[in-house]
Design a protein with these regions (language model features):
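Extracytoplasmic thiol/disulfide redox context detector
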Residues: 2-8, 13-93, 149-174
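Cysteine-centric redox/oxidoreductase cores and disulfide-bonded domains
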Residues: 91-175, 179-199
Length: 199
């Protein structure tokens, strides 16, 4: 259900959206990224053979991101034709940055636990603190204190750095923001609209 793709090429690809118009008809932007760059560090959830790909920019302390996450979870439960690529874009301070690094540590080391941790961090939202994050990790049979300190010890994270560059290149100004196939959707997408976009 989960596979990896290459974040380090995505910036270049999305900066050259216009050149993709000459690609094969079935090679839309998001699926082009997935199909050609499978070896890397971006969390992806859903059917690996899905025709619809959503690339989601988010921050764990963003209230609308949490609301959108519930919609995406519902979409994934309803459809096997959608996969979601999660791009950590921590713009709401240090605890957001730490949460993003923790999520990527989980993806790298315990990928089967990623979706549960991701959803748990989303539920913590704006009120998340060190203690609540550690508790969430412990509840999922992980060493919360160790992982939290590991994240704090990262002076920078290449994946997150690239996500920031990508967001800037796309002209994004806040979270959430989504790339669905060839189109960019800034802001929260109502479930009724989202469900139609991913049909």
């Amino acid at each position: 259900m989960i596979k990896r793709i290459n974040i380090f090429i995505i910036t270049t690809l999305l900066m050259t959206i216009s050149t993709l118009a000459s690609a094969q008809d079935d090679q839309n932007l998001a699926s082009f990224i997935l199909r050609n760059h499978e070896a890397s560090a971006l969390p992806t959830v859903g059917n690996s053979d899905a025709e619809i790909t959503v690339v989601e920019f988010f921050d764990y302390r963003c209230g609308y991101c949490a609301k959108q996450a519930k919609d995406f979870e519902k979409i994934l439960n309803e459809s096997e034709n959608v996969k979601i690529v999660y791009l950590e874009w921590p713009i709401f301070g240090d605890i957001s940055d730490t949460a993003a690094k923790i999520a990527l540590i989980i993806w790298d080391n315990y990928p089967d636990k990623y979706f549960d941790i991701h959803n748990g961090l989303m539920k913590l939202g704006p009120r998340m603190k060190k203690e609540s994050i550690i508790s969430l990790l412990n509840e999922n049979n992980l060493d919360g204190e160790k992982i939290f300190n590991q994240a704090l010890g990262q002076t920078e994270n290449l994946v997150i750095n690239e996500n920031f560059k990508l967001a800037k290149n796309l002209g994004l100004r806040g979270t959430p923001a989504s790339v669905i196939n060839d189109s960019i959707y800034p802001g929260y997408i109502k479930y009724e609209v989202l469900s139609n976009l991913v049909k």
